[in-house]
Amino acid sequence: MKYTKFEKARIIGARALQIAMGAPVIIDIPKNVIDPVDIATIEFENNVIPITIKRVSKVLN
């Protein structure tokens, strides 16, 4: 799925907060990566973040 830059920022930010609060990391990351935002970005790039985006279509009358 193609995400807008706003959706991408929201997904990475939400996942980074989860990681910072102690949520388990889903994929193996390099030992030198400790920043939650960097970890969330790696997860996003590998399409493993467990967050779903629900888009609502606008219906014009």
UniProtKB/Swiss-Prot annotation:
One of its GO terms (cellular component) is cytoplasm. Coiled coil: none annotated. It is found in: Cytoplasm. It is an enzyme of class 2 (transferase). It catalyses: RNA(n) + a ribonucleoside 5'-triphosphate = RNA(n+1) + diphosphate. PROSITE patterns: RNA_POL_K_14KD (PS01111). The keyword Hydrolase does not apply. InterPro entries: DNA-dir_RNA_polK_14-18kDa_CS (IPR020708), Pol_omega/Rpo6/RPB6 (IPR006110), RPB6/omega-like_sf (IPR036161), Rpo6/Rpb6 (IPR006111). Keywords: Cytoplasm, DNA-directed RNA polymerase, Nucleotidyltransferase, Transcription, Transferase. Its EC number is 2.7.7.6. Belongs to the archaeal Rpo6/eukaryotic RPB6 RNA polymerase subunit family. DNA-dependent RNA polymerase (RNAP) catalyzes the transcription of DNA into RNA using the four ribonucleoside triphosphates as substrates. Part of the RNA polymerase complex. This is DNA-directed RNA polymerase subunit Rpo6. It comes from Thermoplasma volcanium (strain ATCC 51530 / DSM 4299 / JCM 9571 / NBRC 15438 / GSS1). The lineage of its organism: Archaea, Methanobacteriati, Thermoplasmatota, Thermoplasmata, Thermoplasmatales.
